[in-house]
Every structure is written in C-alpha cells, then in structure tokens.
C-alpha cells in the first residue's frame, strides 16, 4: 500500500469528508484520500484526493496522478523506510471545538426540534454530539453506518417525502437530509416543504435578508437566478460570480468578506469554519439564522427569491465537447450579447441561456432563466433542440 512508498499514513477510519478536510487544513499532512461507495452505481468505489489545505486537487494534478498510476512509476523504498500508520483519536474533538467556536457564543435563542436523516452517513459519528451541545431535541433516521450498499439517486425522493411527513407529524422546527459524503444537504421546513438545490440557496438568502450583516458578499455560480443578486443587493450584500467547480468555489470563498459560497447543488461553504463544502456546519448555520429570524421557517420562506431557472442535461461524447461548444459560440451566440465565465452565456430578450460542459461526465448542461418557469422551460427546450442538432453534425 501507500506505506511501501515511504509515506506515513494517518488512518481516520470512518469519517465525514468535511472532518477530513478540516484535519488537513493546519496539521502538517501533505494530502488526503477518501474512499466512498459511488452513489450512482452499485459496487463501485469513489476515490477522492485532497491537497494539504483540504481542497480537491486540480484537474491537471489529477491527470498526473492517473499517469503515474497507469505507468506504475511510484516510488519504492527499502523495508527499513516503509511508512508508519498512525491513529489520531482527537480529530473529532478538534473539529467539534472549532465548529462550536465558529457558530459563536450561545448561537440560538430557542431549543430546536429537529428530524435528521443521516442516510447512513459517517456524519453520525460527530453531528449528534454537536447538536446535543447546542441544546437541540433531535429525532434521527437511518443513523447506522453498517449499510452495505450506497443510496441510489432514485431512492432519495422517497426518503425526502418520508422526512417531510415525520417533520409535520412531530411539529418539528425543521428536518435535514444529509448526503452520504457529508458535503450536501436538503432542508425540510416546519410546513413540510422540501428545499434543495437552488431552492435551498433561495431559502438561505431569505434568512440572510432577515438579519443582514453590515457588509459582505456571497459567491454564486454564473447560472444562479438574477433574483438572488437583487434580493441580496437590497440588504446591502454583494454578489460575486465564479466557476461552479469545487476548487473554484473554494478559492472564491477565501476572499475577504465572503459570507458563504455555493454552486446551488446543496453544497454550502461557510468561511467562518473553513473554505470547503460542509453540510454539518451548514446545518448549524441554518439554525443560527433561523434563531435570529424569530419566526417559523415557513414564514421566512414566503420571502425567498423566486427560482425561475430551468436546467437540462444532454449526453455528449467527450471528444465532441470542444467542437460543439465552438459551434454554440459561432452559430447560436454570434449575434447576441454573451459572456464566457463558464461555458457560453447568451442574453435573450427576457432572460438568458447558458451552455456549459460537465467537468467529469460526458454531458452538456443547458440552463435558462426567464420571468416564469414555463417561459424558461420553453427557452431551454429550444436551445436543447439546437444543441442536439449541432451534436448530430459534429
């Protein structure tokens, strides 16, 4: 294994990815690796690499790792130089201390009743302790980690529906569904409404507007609804657009004055603790903002900015991505105002369309915003047809 290359290993065992990232932030290790069952396919394992700051390695570095692995060019050492394996039992204690400190002294003015669906996530090794420290009354679901198979995407809607039913039945203040990696979450308010993806981000913006900071800014992807920027600017909070890639979001979150950053996929970065997606800390921040609002979350939700962005994906072979994106620029966007921060964003009479390539999968993403979801759906469907034609011609 890794020890045969002369590298020492700190074995954290079963641990949420945000805690691993926190461990890497300032304890001297040169990098980290996480192994997790793939959520899309049974029997596959995802291996993720992080640098010494706990940030996803760059795509260029990932390619060099693949090249070294395929050529078997890794270092080999003599038996007396083999790396050692260590354990660090206090990692959870250190994370918990930093977590509570980042939330602040006495962060909540009331005792929250919560329902948490852990989805068999390693978050169960630390989050119950944190919520107990915060004085929350919690009902837990799927808290055992011995499940043999990863949760499939098609199983999630039923889990969310069950969570919403339990939240309503128990008159809980809110419920949370944690994805197995501990980096993304879904929220259910006291009325049983499910908030996920861009909707979750809209709810957070409404909470921020209830008790806006004196200054600061929020980092959003280029395909976020324009209503988000307007809602934030009304309360004096700026908006910065950046790439949706995790590493780009992390770099943007490092800038001074950033309140939070998100790609609108359930991932939330709060620099108060660290510069990476952390569903555990995001949960705590939702509770803090809800406590400041001093009214039910369902009432806060009534002022959430509308989400009128529609998103579609189209299959696209990797070898065709470059040529198709060039054709989009030359044939679909040549006579219209456009920008290229991520993909090609084309201005339309009553909105915009964004065509971008997926970083990992053989897909293209098409986003469109218009005054209503119906108009946005029509706009995105029209561009899907045009891009499909370009794909056939490529």
Sequence positions of predicted segments:
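Gly/Ser/Thr-enriched, mixed-charge loops and adjacent short helices
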Residues: 43-170
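Predominant activation on well-ordered alpha-helical scaffold segments within soluble catalytic domains
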Residues: 3, 21, 66, 100, ...
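Short Gly/Thr/Asp-enriched flexible loops that form oxyanion-binding sites at enzyme active sites
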Residues: 1-2, 43-52, 126-128, 180-201, ...
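N-terminal small/polar loop signature for handling phosphorylated ligands or for N-terminal nucleophile
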Residues: 1-44, 129-188
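Proline/glycine-rich low-complexity loops and linkers
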Residues: 12, 19, 63-97, 101, ...
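Phosphate-binding and adjacent anionic-ligand microenvironments
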Residues: 173-174, 213-394
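Solvent-exposed alpha-helices and their adjacent loops that cap or buttress functional pockets
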Residues: 24-27, 39-42, 105-109, 166-170, ...
């Amino acid at each position: 294994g890794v020890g045969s290359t002369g590298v020492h290993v700190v074995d954290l065992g079963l641990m949420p990815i945000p805690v691993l990232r926190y461990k890497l932030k300032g304890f001297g290790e040169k990098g980290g690796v996480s192994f997790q069952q793939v959520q899309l396919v049974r029997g596959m394992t995802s291996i993720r690499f992080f640098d010494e700051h706990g940030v996803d390695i760059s795509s260029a570095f990932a390619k060099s790792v693949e090249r070294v692995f395929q050529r078997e060019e890794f270092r080999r050492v003599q038996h007396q130089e083999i790396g050692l394996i260590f354990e660090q039992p206090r990692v959870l204690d250190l994370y918990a201390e930093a977590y509570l400190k980042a939330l602040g002294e006495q962060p909540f003015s009331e005792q929250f009743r919560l329902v948490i669906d852990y989805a068999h996530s390693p978050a169960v090794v630390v989050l119950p302790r944190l919520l107990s420290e915060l004085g929350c009354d919690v009902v837990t679901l799927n808290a055992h980690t011995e499940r043999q198979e990863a949760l499939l995407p098609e199983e999630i809607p039923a889990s969310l529906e069950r969570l919403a039913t339990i939240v309503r039945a128990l008159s809980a203040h809110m419920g949370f569904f944690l994805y197995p990696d501990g980096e993304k979450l879904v929220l259910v308010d006291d009325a049983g409404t499910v908030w996920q993806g861009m909707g979750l981000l809209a709810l957070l913006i409404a909470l921020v507007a209830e008790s806006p900071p004196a200054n600061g800014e929020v980092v959003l992807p280029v395909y976020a609804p324009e209503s988000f920027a307007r809602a934030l600017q009304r309360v004096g909070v700026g908006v910065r657009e950046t790439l949706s890639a995790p590493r780009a979001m992390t770099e943007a979150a490092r800038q001074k004055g950033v309140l939070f950053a998100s790609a609108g996929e359930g991932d939330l970065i709060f620099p108060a603790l660290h510069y990476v997606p952390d569903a555990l800390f995001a949960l705590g921040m939702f509770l803090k903002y809800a406590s400041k609002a001093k009214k039910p979350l369902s009432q806060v939700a009534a002022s959430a900015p509308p989400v009128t962005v529609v998103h579609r994906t189209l299959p696209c072979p990797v070898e065709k991505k470059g040529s198709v994106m060039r054709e989009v620029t030359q044939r679909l966007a040549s006579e219209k105002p456009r920008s290229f921060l991520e993909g090609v964003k084309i201005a339309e009479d009553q909105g915009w369309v964004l065509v971008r390539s997926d970083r990992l999968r053989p897909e293209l993403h098409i986003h469109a915003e218009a005054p209503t979801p119906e108009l946005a759906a029509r706009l995105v469907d029209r561009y899907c047809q045009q891009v499909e034609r370009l794909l056939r011609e490529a």
